[in-house]
Regions:
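Conserved SAM/SAH cofactor-binding pocket of Class I
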Residues: 33-127
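Residue-level signal for inorganic ion chemistry
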Residues: 31, 117, 149, 207
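Short, structurally constrained coil/turn elements
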Residues: 9, 88, 180-183, 217
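Class I SAM-dependent transferase core
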Residues: 1-39
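Conserved Class I SAM-dependent methyltransferase catalytic core
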Residues: 14, 20, 143-200
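SAM/dcSAM-binding transferase cores
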Residues: 198-239
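Mobile active-site "lid"/loop adjacent to the S-adenosyl-L-methionine
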Residues: 118-148
Length: 239
């Protein structure tokens, strides 16, 4: 069922979702806030954009060209509707295409920043795939994997341009190895915890094209207090 929801604590942003597929989560808020280091960007692109939560949030924080890329037509349609109800069709462009084909469309050194909330899970003979193809493609590396993401990023990122991802901690080594394979140097890493005393369940990582070798480990990010409420650092992200 298609519904319109408020984008978490953003009072003036709404998002179109289909409750039969997947719902927008905090991942995208964390990614958008982590990725932005300054406001001097000219061109930003969001891979695996889904129904466009990351471009929506970025549009609140920077004034530049923002593009989202979504391969699944049904999800792309949700993204288009999301832009329309927020009156952002003039500020954000959504492409219905495969990320792997972006290098055929854009010249080398086009983008200052790439953001990506990719499918988290590898696919093998033991993978438990969802009956819904749309859910499966959103969660598993059936249509795109880390190799694809970083090989394309190397081509379309400007020199020293950055790519930021939100991912699972058990894929950290895979991510770093793949980054370095494509001359994208890991620059910042932040571990995210649901609450104090819990295990890390999410990572935020940034790499720079042809960057110097210097990885900065940021302070841990805690999401909830003991009562399940957002901590102040998280609340501030919705400003």
């Amino acid at each position: 069922m298609e519904v319109v929801n408020r984008l978490l604590n953003y009072k003036d942003l709404n998002i179109v979702q289909n409750t039969d597929w997947f719902n927008f989560s905090l991942d995208s808020v964390l990614l958008a806030n982590f990725a932005l280091q300054n406001k001097s960007y000219k061109n930003i692109i969001d891979f695996c954009t889904g129904n466009a939560p990351v471009p929506l949030i970025l549009s609140r924080k920077v004034n530049c060209n923002i593009t989202g890329v979504e391969i699944q037509k049904e999800v792309y349609d949700l993204a288009r509707k999301t832009l329309e109800i927020n009156n952002l069709t003039d500020r954000i462009k959504i492409l219905n295409m495969d990320v792997k084909d972006l290098a055929k469309v854009y010249e080398t050194d086009t983008f200052d920043l790439i953001t990506c909330n990719p499918p988290f899970f590898k696919v093998n003979e033991n993978s438990k795939l969802n009956e819904s193809v749309i859910k499966t493609n959103a969660r598993h590396e059936t249509l795109i994997n880390l190799e694809d993401i970083f090989s394309v990023s190397k081509k379309i990122l400007k020199n020293n341009g950055t790519i930021s991802l939100v991912h699972r901690p058990d894929r950290l080594i895979d991510i770093i190895l793949c980054m370095k394979k494509y001359n994208i140097e890991p620059k910042r890493l932040q571990l995210v915890y649901p609450r104090y005393g819990s295990e890390c369940n999410m990572i935020l990582i940034e790499g720079a094209k042809n960057g110097n070798s210097s990885l900065k480990i940021l302070p841990p990010l805690y999401v909830h207090d003991k009562d399940g409420n957002y901590l102040e650092e998280i609340k501030n992200m919705f400003q």
